[in-house]
Amino acid sequence: MFSYRHAFHAGNHADVLKHTVLLAVLRHMTQKEAALNVFDTHAGAGLYRLDGDYAKTSAEAADGFLKLVATQPKEPYAPALKDYIDMVAGFNTTNHWSVYPGSPFIIQSLLSGRDKLKLWEMHPTDIKTLTSNIAQLEAGRQVAILREDGFE
């Protein structure tokens, strides 16, 4: 098994793009009354510390999310990008930017009571962390976590 740990890469430039698009798509999809079933095939731990050892080891967030929020744009941010920054800000009590939500937390924060979220993760440590993190949401049966290959 390839042992990918997203905690080393949380908040990098790819996350900025991926999570901005994810948030915009989900905002659009949740405008309808129909229930959603959302799948995350590589959920990781779901929530990350940008001031933690893993993030500091790679320092990828410094060139991604942290660089974005440290920059004073000449023009206002595009609405989708502003929405993304505001979403991450909602997980932090100050502008210290220590907590970074992964896709599972971004998705779950937008779901209604009729929607479902299914998360797959194979890394033994990350699935334990993911399970603990998701338990804090008290989402009950709305969120299912599977220790399986999300592509199978």
Where in the sequence are the language-model features?
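Conserved beta-strand/loop positions that form the S-adenosyl-L-methionine
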Residues: F39-T41
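Class I S-adenosyl-L-methionine-dependent methyltransferase module
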Residues: L36, A45-E152
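Class I SAM-dependent methyltransferase Rossmann-like catalytic core
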Residues: M1-E33, R49-D63
